[in-house]
C-alpha cells in the first residue's frame, strides 16, 4: 500500500484482467519490504457474516427494525460489541460458553481439541483466550505445552518466577512464554542496554534458521548483553543462560500477541452473541454452515436444547428462523431440487389451506411451482399439514 501509483515503483503484469506484481513478500522471499513498501494481507472471515446476520435478526426481533441497513447493523455493533464498549470481563460469557464447553460456531473453537483445551483451562479473560488459541497449534501441542499450561493455570502456586520482572511479564500466561512480545520485553527489561529495537530484532532472529554471519554476530551480542543484565539484577549466569534457552525453545512456536488478542476478541464477541441472543445466533450459525457440515450443525443445535421443527410449506422461510426460544424452523432452501423461483412463489402466494388449494390456485404460476418443485416438497415432507385422510 503506497500513496502513489504502483507502476512508478514496481513491475506490474496483467493476469486474467487483474493487475499484479511478480514481486513476492513472505517467509522465504522479501522483495517489497527492502523497497519501503508494506504488504497487507486482507482476509475474509465467514464468522463476520454470522455476526452481521445475528445483529440483523436482533434488530428485527427486539428493536422492531423490519429491514436493517448496514448502517443500522454497524450502529448496533458500535454500541454493543465494539472492543471499546463491550464488557470483556462478563463472567456469564466465560461460564456459559468457554468454561461449560458449549460451542456453536464460536470463532477459533470449532475443533474438539480447542474446545477440550478451553474447558480444561477455564479461561476468564481475553488474555486467557489468546493464550489458549496460541497454544492450540501443532508446535506447542507436539511439545506438550497445553498440558503443562493447564497444570500451571490450575495450580498457580507451583509456578516459579526468576524475579519480579519475569513475573510481571509472564504472570498473565502462568509463567509460560507464549507471545513473541514477551521475549522482546524480557530481553529489554532484563538485558543490559538492550533497546526495544534490538529486543524486537532478537524476536525476529530467534525464529530464523541459518543466519548469515552478521545476523549471527548480532544475536550473540544481544545474548552477552542479556546475561550481563541478568547478573546485575541478581539472576545467576546459569539461570540467565537457561532463560535464553527458553527464548530459543519457545520462539519456535511463539505467537504474535496482537494477532492473538485481535482474533480472541472475535471469539469473545461471538460468545457474547451466543450467550445473550442464543436463538438469533443459532439461526445464523445454521444458515452459514455449508451443506457438508449441516447435519453436524443441527446436532449441535439440538445439544443446546433446541427442537427442530419439520419443514412446512406455510411456515418455513428462506432462512432458518426461531418460532420460540426452544424451536428452530428449517428453511425451504434446504430442500434439494426446490429452486429460488419456486420458493419466491410459495412465500408470495401462501398460506395454502389444502393440497387442492396449492394445485388449483389460480394465483400460482405453474412454471415456477412445477412438477419437479412439487416432487421436492413432497419428498421433504413439507406438505404434511395440507394432507387429509384421503392421502
Regions found by a protein language model. Give the residues of each.
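Noncatalytic, beta-rich nucleic-acid-contacting surfaces in large DNA/RNA-processing enzymes
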Residues: 1-391
Amino acid at each position: 500500500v503506497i500513496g502513489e501509483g504502483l507502476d512508478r515503483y514496481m513491475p506490474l503484469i496483467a493476469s486474467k484482467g487483474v493487475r499484479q506484481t511478480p514481486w513476492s513478500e513472505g517467509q522465504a522471499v522479501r522483495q517489497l519490504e527492502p523497497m519501503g513498501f508494506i504488504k497487507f494481507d486482507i482476509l475474509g472471515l465467514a464468522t463476520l457474516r454470522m455476526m452481521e446476520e445475528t445483529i440483523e435478526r436482533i434488530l428485527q426481533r427486539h428493536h422492531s427494525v423490519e429491514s436493517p441497513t448496514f448502517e443500522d447493523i454497524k450502529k448496533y455493533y458500535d454500541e454493543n460489541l465494539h472492543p471499546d464498549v463491550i464488557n470483556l470481563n462478563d463472567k456469564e460469557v466465560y461460564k456459559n460458553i468457554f468454561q461449560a464447553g458449549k460451542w456453536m460456531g464460536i470463532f477459533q473453537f470449532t475443533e474438539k481439541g480447542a474446545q477440550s483445551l478451553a474447558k480444561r483451562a477455564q479461561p476468564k479473560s481475553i488474555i486467557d483466550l489468546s493464550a489458549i488459541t496460541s497454544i492450540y497449534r501443532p508446535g506447542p501441542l507436539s511439545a506438550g505445552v497445553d498440558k503443562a499450561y493447564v497444570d500451571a493455570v490450575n495450580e498457580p502456586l507451583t509456578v516459579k518466577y526468576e524475579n519480579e520482572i519475569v513475573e510481571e511479564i509472564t504472570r498473565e500466561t502462568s509463567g509460560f512464554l507464549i507471545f513473541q512480545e514477551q521475549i522482546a520485553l524480557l530481553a529489554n527489561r532484563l538485558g543490559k542496554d538492550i533497546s526495544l529495537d534490538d529486543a524486537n530484532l532478537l524476536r525476529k532472529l530467534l525464529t530464523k534458521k541459518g543466519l548469515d554471519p552478521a545476523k549471527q554476530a548480532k544475536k550473540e551480542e544481544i545474548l552477552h548483553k542479556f546475561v550481563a543484565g541478568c547478573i546485575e539484577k541478581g539472576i545467576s549466569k546459569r539461570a540467565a543462560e537457561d532463560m535464553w534457552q527458553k527464548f530459543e525453545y519457545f520462539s519456535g512456536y511463539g505467537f504474535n500477541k496482537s494477532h492473538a488478542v485481535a482474533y480472541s476478541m472475535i471469539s469473545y464477541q461471538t460468545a457474547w452473541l451466543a450467550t445473550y441472543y442464543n436463538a438469533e445466533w443459532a439461526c445464523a450459525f445454521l444458515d452459514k454452515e455449508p451443506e457438508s457440515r449441516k447435519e453436524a450443525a443441527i446436532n449441535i443445535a439440538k445439544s443446546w436444547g433446541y427442537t427442530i421443527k419439520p419443514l412446512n410449506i406455510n411456515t418455513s422461510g428462506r432462512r432458518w428462523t426461531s418460532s420460540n426460544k426452544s424451536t428452530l424452523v428449517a428453511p425451504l432452501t434446504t430442500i434439494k431440487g426446490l429452486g429460488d423461483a419456486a420458493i419466491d412463489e410459495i412465500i408470495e402466494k401462501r398460506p395454502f389451506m389444502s393440497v387442492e388449494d396449492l394445485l388449483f390456485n389460480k394465483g400460482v404460476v405453474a412454471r415456477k411451482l412445477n412438477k419437479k418443485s412439487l416432487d421436492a416438497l413432497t419428498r421433504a415432507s413439507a406438505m404434511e399439514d395440507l394432507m387429509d385422510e384421503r392421502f
